[in-house]
Swiss-Prot record:
Keyword Repeat in record: no
Domain writeup: The cysteine framework is XXVIII (C-C-C-CC-C-C-C-C-C).
Entry protein name: Conotoxin Im28.1
Annotated keywords: Disulfide bond, Neurotoxin, Secreted, Signal, Toxin
GO terms of molecular function: toxin activity
PTM (free text): Contains 5 disulfide bonds.
Length: 85
């Protein structure tokens, strides 16, 4: 096999071995990054003891949450929060 063909074969096989060993890169989720950035700019924690967040673009109570549990309305299929001040 000529050197050029051998070199091309090695260059084609080498990345496959690297991907198999390391695994594919995790999918990039732009939505999570946007929400995280928005929360850093606009959200204010009520206290250090509670995980609730005062205002957030996501309609959830708690977790990545949208508002304090006391003012969150979860009567429907989706939780809603009062508008941020």
């Amino acid at each position: 096999m000529p050197k050029l063909e051998m070199m091309l074969l090695v260059l084609l096989i080498l990345p496959l071995c690297y991907i198999d060993a390391v695994g594919p890169p995790p999918p990039w989720n732009m939505e999570d990054e946007i929400i995280e950035h928005w929360q850093k700019l606009h959200c204010h924690e009520i206290s250090d003891l509670t995980p609730w967040i005062l205002c957030s673009p996501e309609p959830l109570c708690g977790g990545k949450g949208c508002c304090a549990q006391e003012v969150c309305d979860c009567s429907g299929p989706v939780c809603t929060c009062p508008p941020c001040l």
